[in-house]
Amino acid sequence: MKPGDHYITNDPWLTSGHLHDITVVTPSFYRGEPVGLFANTIHVVDIGGLGMGPDGRQVFEEGLAIPIMPLAREGRMNEDLLHLVRANVREPLQVEGDIYACAACNDEGSRRLIAMMDEFEIANLDRLGETIIDASREATLARIRALPHGIYKNSLTMDGYDKPLILNAAMAISDDGIHVDFDGTSPASSYGINVVYNYCLAYTAFGVKCLVAPEVPNNAGSLAPITVSAPEGCVLNVKRPWPVAARHTVGHMLPDVVFGCLHQVMSGGVPAEGASSLWNPQIFGGGSLVDDVDEGTDANSLPQFSTVIFHCGGAGARPEKDGLSATAFPSGVRTIPIEATESVAPVLFYRREFREGSGGAGKFRGGLGQVIELGGACATPLALLCNFERVRNPARGRNGGQAGAAGKVTLRSGRPIRPKGRQTVPPRDAIRLELPGGGGFGDPRERDPERVRDDLLDGMITANDARRDYGVVVDKHGRIDLTETNRLRALRPPK
């Protein structure tokens, strides 16, 4: 390695779990000696192949694979590689620009590191790194050792592609750390919703750390006490060449699984289940990709494009707070403004709003999902790769809280749509996405009536929700009917 070198790969089994995520790694040098590596991962809008959907039966169908190889040597970009990438993706300028951005990001990180080392007269990072990693490991272990030791189990059923999947977890807590074993989890799917081991490890460890040691910095030391095993060949540990393009569909459920284990040992409770898995369809245009074209329209004249939208349902209610609405947990991905999508592709959003009544009822309400309607601008037909979970198995509540609303997918015209796989939105029609809500926490009859009224006035729930789930009646002037509310709550007091 030399200054100015950059390395690139999108190998799912080495990095982020599917071909759409490209990782760039850059060595950093101080006074001619290597002192560290900077790395970042970016989700590109397209990587060729079938796209970011679950329809592929092997990873070879899912796009262009880039093994670990030089992106640049001593500051000179590998033009042959970039030419190959541009030739294999539907949006070459965007993808190439993203790759350059990754390299620039690492370069900026390296410049700041060197400036810090100059300022504090640090020759290398060995002792500093060891100190941080050792301290972080001990801090995480201290939190783990304070928990009741034992083995705690939880199971979660999810929709799957064509049949339900079961994620089984057994969490062993000891002085040595936390080990999560996924023995008993469903076998691998024939479709691209499978998870590679490193992605399983990452989201399992993240779920544990969120609750056990959230304030400890993320590094090799703080994560070392959290270990994971998953049987080879199960949906959480597939080997090449099994399909993995939509691996987030399953992987994003893992924190909910481990939360269910930790709920049994954490006295303050843990959040209820949330929508968890992103609803992020890839949207295509082009005459060869759509099934519905107006009579008399030349299919060759339809615009060719590819884009991805990221949207999310509601998060689970917390032990002392309502769940966050339309918020991506555990991924942390920010929702793309609809104006940004409309500016880069012939896509038109007709509606985007909170989904009334979708948050699970509870002393603390689950976060709301959202309703989104979109179609092609100027009567353009669209092809979508759908990866929608929580349609048949909604997010469960906790401590007496109710489940969030299940997701729903339809066309505005009424034609049914499958929640997973390639679909077509005809000209002048629109797909309607009703994203799932998060589960509630605690008995709904314990919720402060004032908060129920506020939810009603804010359009978060309906009057029927307030009466049926919470035992709260609000008159036409927005005032709580205390007599009727007390009567309803007396009929079914909190458990």
Q: What are these regions, as identified by a protein language model?
A:
Residues M1-K495:
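Glycine/proline-enriched, intrinsically flexible loops and inter-domain linkers
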